[in-house]
Amino acid sequence: MFDSTLNPLWQRYILAVQEEVKPALGCTEPISLALAAAVAAAELEGPVERVEAWVSPNLMKNGLGVTVPGTGMVGLPIAAALGALGGNANAGLEVLKDATAQAIADAKALLAAGKVSVKIQEPCNEILFSRAKVWNGEKWACVTIVGGHTNIVHIETHNGVVFTQQACVAEGEQESPLTVLSRTTLAEILKFVNEVPFAAIRFILDSAKLNCALSQEGLSGKWGLHIGATLEKQCERGLLAKDLSSSIVIRTSAASDARMGGATLPAMSNSGSGNQGITATMPVVVVAEHFGADDERLARALMLSHLSAIYIHNQLPRLSALCAATTAAMGAAAGMAWLVDGRYETISMAISSMIGDVSGMICDGASNSCAMKVSTSASAAWKAVLMALDDTAVTGNEGIVAHDVEQSIANLCALASHSMQQTDRQIIEIMASKAR
């Protein structure tokens, strides 16, 4: 429940964060399909004997090369199979949290028997689309998710339609928090962060708790490309400085290593992505620890980071050719700048420099290499903050950066939303040719 004395706009900000910053176990694209399969299995009369699935090209792109937690296997077929046989239909993005060793073995057996198929939905106008149909003999159940990783729009069985999401909005219904957020500004977000009661945003500290645990697991060196663990070793060997900049990169990339390598620990996601949640969280946590910030100061910095990341990503397609670790790191830059300096000018300069630095990074699907992009984005964020502290930034005379940070963000998002659509198609074509 909200404090009734809170500014209504602030209430919408908090709702936006609560909707977009959630625990997620495993990369969220295959997990979206696993959820569809789990919900379908819950509707099926009898045990699952066969699974069919269809996904959008973008979801296929992000599901081809990522490890599904607990399985040691990559790809959408194992996600669909495990969701159907061991998923918790009520757990959202943590659908696989209760999967047992037996369920994993059964899912692998179903896969080996050729009873699982995943195809691209054609035609498909949706960026994020997953549909799972599970069978028991002639009986079946089918679930469709569209637009958001957990947004179930249709449930149907051989007996008929169970549920269909109504597209219309009831008269007098409040606008969604993201719609409200689309009309705000970074200056208004900063005012909120500075003035909102700590008790109203204390919950954001959970992002530090979850993502720090994931980072610690990643430092074991067992996961993914073990970038964080490797860089930590290089510090011990004297090849990399043991300083704040290194700590930011090491601890952030370690969390992504564990995330993408299939560790069975949840990440606190942002905008439907664990890596975005990690990127918006870990750099801020490391800087807060460096300065000895208390819980309230950390919570305000994390709220600024996560809300800024959501604000920017809300102007993008849910999935695109632009690596969204870059936009999440713009949020992190804001949070770190606030911890060190607190001024709007420093925050806006840091974000502008980020846009002038890493905005061209492509998303070529979810995989272990995402941790490389996460580490690059985290490093760029801290560099941008250091520049801003010295009153230096990429200016409006250069490239897509404008004189106003809001216009710079709009320019970046226009590039991703329009011109990079062809880039996205080319990436998907290249990846599909590799999978043949």
Swiss-Prot record:
One MF annotation (Gene Ontology) recorded for this entry: L-cysteine desulfhydrase activity
InterPro entries registered for this protein in UniProt: Ser_deHydtase-like_asu, UPF0597
Listed GO biological process terms: L-cysteine catabolic process to pyruvate
Signal peptide: none
HAMAP family noted in UniProt: UPF0597
Similarity field: Belongs to the UPF0597 family.
UniProt-recorded name of the protein: UPF0597 protein YhaM
Gene transcribed to yield this protein: yhaM
